[in-house]
């Protein structure tokens, strides 16, 4: 219920699109299990297309002139149709949960797991609130056992979760945001850095980027831990990598799973 309330509070109408996406995925996954290979692929493509269409239409096609040039009167204020869509229709975390449910569909299609028979579990997987803001993008086989196991109030989990959140806030607010001031000064539009200044700027930017992303993920993981639900670690000290491939694996460990989409044939 907390996840539904979170999505509803962020966008009342947006909750409808979350439910619509989860219904498409739930029905498609069940159907994929029951049909032959040719029909499986058609159902997969149609369901993926439906989910992506909702995402692309609300987030990107709303920028077309047909939406930006038309105004509506909302609560006494005149707003462009594009502004109405962005403010009232787009669900929070739409890009994240769309990629997440597509990974679930692909796992069912490839036979890596059985389709979930309980719709409410699919819906909760779609809109579990801590990861909607910044990820991480989780596979159903990894997140479902954490979501649907029996949960009890555990002060150890709460203590660990709060510590993780404080560590995340420290990295994001006291390191990333502070270093960002110097990075902006070095790479200001009217300034072209050279030599040592440019190298210092690049190093500072790398630290800022890492602390910003990893700090945000730590806050999310910490909030989830308070409920006894563990989320996968998304950053594993990438700057200690010995190769570019290892750097990529350590930098965004969950995003590499979404790269499987590129291998679909």
Segments predicted by a language model, with ranges:
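Membrane-embedded transmembrane alpha-helical bundles that form the catalytic cores
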Residues: 1-265
